[in-house]
Design a protein with these regions (language model features):
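Histone-fold recognition with a strong bias for associated Lys/Arg-rich disordered tails
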Residues: 1-202
Length: 202
């Protein structure tokens, strides 16, 4: 695998915009942590919450670290060019290994976060320590959310919670007596059955 999921690409782009906005020459782990935590419907805020870490507080702390990075301005610098720092590069390499280990076909946001946990730069390391985030804790909450599903598409987040959400929505709808008759929805139902049987096979 060397393909990133949509959310990983979005986070990399957001991190790059952040670095440009702050006139930072290098894309650091801190930028990436802010970008990953900012993904509203993303997996990382959800996993942080499950580790009893408030995503907003974590994001603010990471953003504070970004604001302390050296600003590079002046004629010699192309404002739109940002290179990946050594530390982030190592974390992305670790993320790729993590994806392979987990037999995933794409590098997803959880692999990137895990990569930073395994190869933290000094500043990211301080953040993880401050919030009590460890690789073990992270893997624990990740497997609770992901179950034994593998990342086989570039948009895996849509499936992780789909079943839980779908089940929940049906229960709530039944309570509120809002369930539609099932006529004409066979394609939808087939879809759910396919997802369920795939889950069993895994």
């Amino acid at each position: 695998t060397n393909q990133f999921t949509q959310k990983t690409m979005e986070a990399l782009q957001a991190a790059q915009r952040l670095a440009i906005e702050y006139s930072n020459q290098a894309l650091e782990q801190e930028h990436m942590l802010v970008a990953l935590t900012q993904q509203q419907d993303g997996l990382i805020p959800q996993l942080l919450t499950k580790m009893n870490v408030d995503p907003g507080t974590f994001e603010a702390a990471a953003a504070e670290k970004v604001s302390q990075l050296p600003h590079v301005t002046g004629s010699g610098r192309d404002p739109d060019k940002v290179y990946i720092s050594n530390e982030l590069d190592q974390a992305l390499t670790a993320a790729e290994k993590q994806a392979q280990q987990m037999k995933d076909e794409y590098i997803s946001v959880e692999h990137v976060f895990m990569g930073m946990l395994q190869r933290p730069g000094r500043v990211a390391g301080e953040l993880f320590k401050q919030f009590g985030i460890t690789p073990e804790k992270f893997m624990q909450v990740l497997s609770a959310v992901r179950g034994n599903q593998r990342v086989t598409t570039d948009n895996p987040e849509s499936t992780y919670d789909a079943l839980k959400k779908y089940g929940q929505d049906l229960v709530e709808a039944a309570r509120a007596n809002k369930l539609d008759p099932v006529i004409g929805r066979d394609s939808e139902i087939r879809n759910v059955i396919r997802i369920l049987s795939r889950k069993r096979k895994n």
